Amino acid sequence: MKPYQRQFIEFALNKQVLKFGEFTLKSGRKSPYFFNAGLFNTGRDLALLGRFYAEALVDSGIEFDLLFGPAYKGIPIATTTAVALAEHHDKDLPYCFNRKEAKDHGEGGSLVGSALQGRVMLVDDVITAGTAIRESMEIIQAHRATLAGVLISLDRQERGRGEISAIQEVERDYGCKVISIITLKDLIAYLEEKPDMAEHLAAVRAYREEFGV
């Protein structure tokens, strides 16, 4: 685990974005942890979040021309990541996002920001069922751009309804790499360093054993 990944876990814990306990997911599964990126909700949170996303992008080595944030959660993520890449990595890249409903006045169209072209890096909070990615792919393909990759904050590394995860389905269906700031494996590595969190470690390991990919 890299220093920025450990820092991201601590940031998420401090903001109660990441919690350990017993939680029932939408799928009906009982999970020993819960991650709610919507609680990154202040100016400072967003500034820090952008730096973690930018760090993960640079670390990945994936080449791309533009950041795309799917509405709605992806919009602030794309914006703050673009700022962080420019400020901390000297990479001044365009970004854009979609509207849920197209406008018929003003700028018009369903996109806001830069023209959607070239190699697109899609940024979002998490992938649950992959629906937002599929909707975004329709937009990207309609503009004759290509999907360079997808970056999310957390990869739960667990099976969907079939034998593979929603993330693996996206990689298979679109031939792109999905990267994340942290994974379930990183969470386990972090818990292993914290003797006072041993009870959570056992529960998360058991969950991975049952649902992991």
UniProtKB/Swiss-Prot annotation:
What GO CC annotations are associated with the protein? cytoplasm
InterPro entries recorded for this chain?
OPRT, Or_phspho_trans_dom, PRibTrfase_dom, PRTase-like
Q: Which cofactor does it need?
A: Mg(2+)
Q: Which reaction does it catalyse?
A: orotidine 5'-phosphate + diphosphate = orotate + 5-phospho-alpha-D-ribose 1-diphosphate
Its annotated pathway reads: Pyrimidine metabolism; UMP biosynthesis via de novo pathway; UMP from orotate: step 1/2
Which residue pairs form cystines in this protein? none
A GO molecular function for this record?
Answer: magnesium ion binding
Q: What is its EC number?
A: 2.4.2.10
- Residues that bind 5-phospho-alpha-D-ribose 1-diphosphate, according to the entry? 26, 72-73, 99-100, 103, 105, 124-132
The biological process GO terms on file are: 'de novo' pyrimidine nucleobase biosynthetic process; 'de novo' UMP biosynthetic process; pyrimidine ribonucleoside biosynthetic process
Top-level taxon of the source organism: Bacteria
Residue sites binding orotate per the record: 34-35, 128, 156
What this chain does, per the entry, is described as: Catalyzes the transfer of a ribosyl phosphate group from 5-phosphoribose 1-diphosphate to orotate, leading to the formation of orotidine monophosphate (OMP).
NCBIfam families, alphabetically? pyrE
Subunit notes for this chain? Answer: Homodimer.
Task: Write the protein's name.
Answer: Orotate phosphoribosyltransferase
